[in-house]
Amino acid sequence: MDILNQIRENADAFSDRPAIISENGSVTWRGLYDGSRRLAERINNMCAPGSRAPLVVCGHKSPYMIMSMLACAYAGHAYCPVDISMPAERVADIIDAVSPEIVLAAEESALDLLPQDGGFFLMPPR
């Protein structure tokens, strides 16, 4: 069984139980599944039709970082995780090397490290 199917099954069986608990927040199995599926839909709507280009997910140890990575997988995209503790120059180099269609900011503080030329949005959707 793959991880995406297991998350769906856990959402059905344990919907209100915590899937992720961290000092930066928590999310239930249902929240993890539904949130990552909604974000996957947004990714597919923002990317070129049929695109499977890699994406960058920028954040730090939050449930939304994991949700963003799962969303990339649900949308059929590879992803490159980037931690906000990295120097801004290194983050820029990674983004240049990956050339993603979208950079997902898994938390607001990640926006400070990202280029200001568009193509990214804050997770969770507000």
Residues covered by each model-derived region:
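Carrier-protein-dependent adenylate-forming modules in NRPS/ANL systems
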Residues: 1-126
